[in-house]
């Protein structure tokens, strides 16, 4: 009894020391672009609130071509891909960008996950780095779960972990989001929460297909698990999902359709959005020329800083020439097609401060690919959008933009100059779009607790209490047939059928007896 009391006191003293001096947090990021941006922001938030933060970062040319990493206030441990493989990986990204108009989304997604599995083997073979990370004895990891390898790294290091993801994962495995398929669209379904019968049928079949695809993706990592985990303790991804202390999704209900989620889920959409800073004098002079018409911002995210298809660029450039607004377009100047004359109202720039431009009082519209960070920043500043989705979740995001009356979208294979110009005119000229954007901005800005405070408080809570087992529902331990009461429905059906059968049998017996009695009476 005394030993147990001493252990409890020692545990409480350790937790008090950790909270007093800051927990040791490892953030894990193996992909650039917007993924790096939000992991960097989370790392800075935790560092600025007294945590001892280290980021385990994969650095590779081609992933962050235009983003110059600022000097990080937190510690960085980096690793890089083999030069020969890096060339192959960069070519994969380049091909995806060159062929985005006709690419097969499924094969492209599987191709990316195949590359992630190959990179995972390389990470685990970095024994000196892995040993260094293990010796640090981190209290908690925050991972970018879009790359499944981050789960395995955390498990190998023996660190409890928080998973971040760009959108809510509606999975048969446990990701904190119950699967209510009647009104919760499955990833890539391009549906809203208002589904008719055939749309619900589509949603169910896509859910089944996504479950099959998930198992296919996670099987790509079987070799890593078999090689680097003992046979007696090899984890499955289903187990790792269940072990996740907290799911943090880069969205919120300003853009997401309302739905339930478990207590171990936190929506942090808009964490990158900030009050705008003044733009450069050069940009201010250009914007001033727009007069009352204002200007629009055009950017296709950190992964597609320019567009290799001259036809696509020509349609956009021609479309912009038909509108009175000034246009600030993030596009690599060195890659502008020489055969095209830049429209007189367009200014192209290698890099733009999107958040600051969106917060400018003359900003009228954002033309976007539909990335989560761009959408959340536009909502924060109350700017409507025209989306031209290119990859993955961007198609679903574009549907949400339209459903929330934040703007409209144009399918990438239907982009024409006149169609783009008309869409811009309709959204800027339609007062209801601006009103919707301003209303959602108010919702996002007036939430009781800022996103950065929520992140900090949750991390402190998890470190203090040693996990979130108290928030995990029992459904995590139930098989699907119990979760959905299939056994109960089967039992009820058997009882009803049995009761009907017995009733019919009894009626037949009664009728036969009655008929026999009448015959006897007649005789």
UniProtKB/Swiss-Prot annotation:
Catalytic activity field: glucuronate acceptor + UDP-alpha-D-glucuronate = acceptor beta-D-glucuronoside + UDP + H(+)
Bilayer topology annotation: Single-pass type I membrane protein
Entry's localization field: Membrane
An example Gene Ontology molecular-function term: glucuronosyltransferase activity
EC numbers: 2.4.1.17
GO CC terms of this entry: UDP-N-acetylglucosamine transferase complex
Pfam families: UDPGT
Membrane-spanning residues: 484-504
Record bears the keyword ATP-binding: no
Cytoplasmic compartment residues: 505-523
CDD domains (alphabetical): GT1_Gtf-like
Record-linked PROSITE patterns: UDPGT (PS00375)
Glycosylation sites: 125
Extracellular side: 24-483
InterPro entries: UDP-glycosyltransferase (IPR050271), UDP_glucos_trans (IPR002213), UDP_glycos_trans_CS (IPR035595)
Record bears the keyword Signal: yes
Keyword entries, A-Z: Glycoprotein, Glycosyltransferase, Membrane, Signal, Transferase, Transmembrane, Transmembrane helix
Enzyme class: transferase
Leader sequence segment: 1-23
Role: UDP-glucuronosyltransferases catalyze phase II biotransformation reactions in which lipophilic substrates are conjugated with glucuronic acid to increase water solubility and enhance excretion. They are of major importance in the conjugation and subsequent elimination of potentially toxic xenobiotics and endogenous compounds.
Record family assignment: Belongs to the UDP-glycosyltransferase family.
Name the UniProt record assigns to this protein: UDP-glucuronosyltransferase 3A1
Species this protein is from: Xenopus laevis (African clawed frog)
Gene that specifies this protein: ugt3a1
């Amino acid at each position: 009894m005394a030993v147990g009391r001493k252990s409890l006191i020692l545990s409480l003293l350790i937790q008090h020391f950790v909270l007093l001096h800051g927990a040791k947090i490892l953030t894990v990021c193996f992909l650039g672009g917007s993924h790096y941006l939000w992991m960097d922001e989370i790392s800075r938030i935790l560092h600025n609130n007294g945590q001892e933060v280290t980021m385990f970062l994969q650095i590779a040319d081609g992933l962050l071509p235009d983003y110059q990493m600022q000097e990080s206030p937190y510690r960085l441990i980096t690793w890089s891909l083999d030069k020969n493989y890096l060339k192959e990986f960069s070519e994969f990204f380049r091909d995806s960008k060159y062929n985005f108009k006709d690419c097969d989304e499924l094969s492209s997604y599987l191709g990316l996950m195949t590359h992630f599995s190959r990179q995972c083997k390389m990470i685990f073979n970095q024994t000196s780095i892995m040993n260094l990370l293990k010796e640090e004895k981190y209290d908690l990891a925050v991972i970018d779960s879009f790359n499944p390898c981050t789960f395995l790294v955390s498990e190998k290091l023996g660190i409890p972990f928080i998973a971040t993801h760009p959108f809510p994962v509606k999975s048969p495995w446990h990701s904190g989001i119950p699967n209510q398929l009647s009104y919760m669209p499955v990833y890539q379904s391009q549906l809203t929460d208002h589904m008719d019968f055939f749309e619900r049928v589509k949603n169910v079949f896509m859910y089944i297909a996504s479950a099959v695809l998930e198992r296919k993706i996670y099987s790509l990592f079987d070799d890593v698990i078999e090689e680097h985990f003992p046979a007696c303790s090899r984890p499955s991804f289903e187990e790792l999902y269940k072990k996740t202390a907290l799911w943090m999704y880069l969205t919120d209900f300003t853009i997401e359709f309302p739905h339930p989620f478990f207590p171990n889920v936190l929506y942090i959409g808009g964490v990158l959005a900030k009050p705008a800073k003044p733009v450069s004098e050069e940009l201010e002079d250009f914007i001033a020329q727009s007069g009352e018409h204002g200007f629009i911002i055009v950017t296709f995210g950190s992964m597609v800083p320019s567009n290799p298809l001259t036809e696509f660029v020509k349609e956009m450039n021609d479309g912009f020439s038909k509108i009175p607004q000034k246009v600030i377009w993030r596009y690599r100047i060195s890659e502008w097609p020489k055969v095209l004359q830049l429209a007189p109202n367009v200014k192209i720039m290698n890099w733009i401060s999107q958040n600051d431009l969106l917060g400018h009082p003359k900003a009228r519209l954002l033309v976007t690919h539909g990335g989560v960070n761009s959408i959340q920043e536009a909502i924060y500043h109350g700017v409507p959008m025209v989306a031209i989705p290119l990859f993955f979740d961007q198609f679903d995001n574009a549907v949400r933009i339209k459903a929330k009356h934040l703007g409209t979208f144009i399918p990438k294979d239907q982009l024409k100059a006149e169609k783009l110009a008309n869409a811009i005119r309709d959204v800027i000229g339609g007062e209801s779009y601006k009103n919707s954007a301003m209303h959602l901005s108010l919702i996002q800005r007036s939430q009781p607790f800022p996103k950065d405070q929520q992140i900090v408080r949750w991390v402190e809570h998890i470190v203090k209490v040693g996990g979130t087992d108290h928030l995990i529902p029992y459904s995590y331990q139930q098989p699907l047939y119990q979760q959905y009461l299939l056994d109960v429905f089967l039992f009820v059906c058997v009882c009803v059928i049995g009761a009907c059968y017995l009733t019919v049998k009894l009626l037949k017996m009664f009728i036969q007896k009655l008929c026999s009695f009448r015959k006897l009476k007649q005789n």
